[in-house]
């Protein structure tokens, strides 16, 4: 097997591991009852109000994010980016599996510990899926497009996405139940800390990942 093929296989394997770790982090975040991360706050609110599985709601939300990218890019959406649909399905499938087998902790100390673990895993999963440079998950893809359309970078787009997601999630909660659903102190902590985890992980591993996966 050629070196280039080996790197592609490793690249795809790391991407799939990254998606699984990201999905685990997202699921753990929902189990804390302290507030979910902005990336899934909208589908989580819908799932809780209407009784859908979180994974199913995330898949639908990700498809909407893909459509928004197409609209914002005014038809200049690269055809290979439609692979985001496959990434959406894999992520939502892992979320559904983890959601069914992971219990919800009762004690506050354990909930805080789970929140910390969720943020770490979400950051690592997001970093790995981006670092191998195959296909972004639709939320990150939309954040990148938002940044571009505003003449800014992806970081700006991510902040805009997170803020918008929280506002929309609050609106969904108040309209559906008269109170916030899935938004809490955990949401704020996740929004602030996940980026720090990504930065720290990339500081130690990004170059190594690129060396062993990029042909």
Question: Where do the model's predicted regions map?
Answer:
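Core subunits and conserved enzymes of cellular information-processing
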Residues: 1-215
